[in-house]
Each structure stands twice: as structure tokens, then as C-alpha cells.
Regions:
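Short secondary-structure boundary micro-motifs
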Residues: 14, 26-29, 63-65, 105-106, ...
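Short hydrophobic/aromatic-rich motifs at helix boundaries and adjacent loops
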Residues: 10-14, 70-72, 119, 135-136
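Single conserved hydrophobic/aromatic residue that forms the stacking wall/gate
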Residues: 1-12
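Structural motif marking the loop-to-transmembrane transition
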Residues: 4, 30, 34, 48-53, ...
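Alpha-helical transmembrane segments in multi-pass membrane proteins
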Residues: 13-17, 39, 43, 54-62, ...
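Alpha-helical membrane segments and adjacent membrane-interface helices in multi-pass membrane proteins
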Residues: 21-99
Length: 174
């Protein structure tokens, strides 16, 4: 039955986000997760409607207390954790997934890189805005909330840009 397989597919999409948030990959200067990669991947591979729905449901699961977020405790803490220092980044997942869905097969490699960079940037812009509001603008917000992750983000953007055209061909075929 197609509704059962669609339901299972929705579970797998959110599980991919959860798993990508929990696995730490050694990287310099800080370990990275593949969470932002998966957020962009969902937008590219599923389009904006299903990509946004998948990310939105993932965020809702975290808000409701499931331990889906990176560094969230085993029992989760729901809204309290969500409204902490990472809330802006988490909300940025929605804009990033949407913007990543705008990549298409006619885009040059440079355009794909540009679109994915803009999508990723929205995560950090919203994240830094919230972080600054939460901890104070007198702190080195960029040094805390973006600089340690720049190399990892460049790596993930390049990786996704290299496989994006194939992903879109598969999406269009299905």
C-alpha cells in the first residue's frame, strides 16, 4: 500500500536527521555532524514541500521531548532544549531546506555551490541572531557560533554540490 510506504519514508527521513545529529565525525577545529548536510539533502532530494515537512516534523519531535537534537539528553527536554542557544540554528534548518530545494539540473556547478552556500548561511544567520539575543551582543558571537564550523560546512557544501545533479536525476526519475 502506497500510504504505508509513504509513512515509512517519512519516518526514515526524520531518522536520517536524528542520526546525522548524533554522530560526531572528527574534524578540525571541532567535531562535525552531518546534520546540515542532511537538511540540505532533504531539500534537494525531496523538493520544498516534503523537505520542509520532514524538517518541520523533526523539529516538532524535538519540541515534544524526543531526544532527536544534537547533544540533547537521552530523555530529551523538549521546548526547554529547543529554546536554548541552538534554537536559531534549528529554525534555520527550515529556510535552508527550502532554499536547497531551489537547486535544479540546469544550474551550473558554481550556481549549485552558490545556492547551497546561501541555504547554509541562513542556518548561521538565524543561529547567530538568536545566540546574540540570548547571550548578549557584547560577546564574540561569530567566534562562538560560526567560526569553529566553517571548514566543516565548506566540506559538506562541496560534497553535496558534487552529488546534487545525480540526486535530482534520481528524484525526477522517481
Amino acid at each position: 500500500d502506497s500510504s504505508t510506504s509513504r509513512g515509512l519514508g517519512d519516518v526514515y527521513k526524520r531518522q536520517a536527521l536524528t542520526i546525522s545529529a548524533k554522530i560526531k565525525i572528527p574534524f578540525y577545529p571541532v567535531p562535525m555532524t552531518m546534520q546540515t548536510f542532511v537538511v540540505l539533502f532533504l531539500g534537494v532530494s525531496l523538493g520544498y514541500k516534503i523537505g520542509l515537512a520532514s524538517v518541520g516534523l523533526y523539529l516538532l519531535e524535538g519540541i515534544l521531548g524526543l531526544p532527536v537534537f544534537s547533544n540533547s539528553p537521552e530523555k530529551g527536554v523538549g521546548l526547554i532544549y529547543f529554546t536554548g542557544p541552538t534554537m536559531g540554528y534549528l529554525i534555520g534548518f527550515l529556510t535552508a531546506s527550502y532554499l536547497a530545494s531551489k537547486v535544479n539540473n540546469r544550474d551550473s556547478f558554481l550556481m549549485v555551490l552558490t545556492k547551497l552556500t546561501i541555504a547554509t548561511s541562513t542556518i548561521y544567520i538565524l543561529g547567530l541572531l538568536w545566540l546574540g539575543t540570548l547571550i548578549g551582543w557584547d560577546k564574540p558571537i561569530f567566534a562562538f557560533g560560526a567560526k569553529p564550523f566553517l571548514l566543516a560546512e565548506i566540506f559538506k557544501i562541496m560534497l553535496l554540490a558534487l552529488i546534487t545533479k545525480k540526486i535530482i536525476k534520481i528524484r525526477n526519475f522517481i
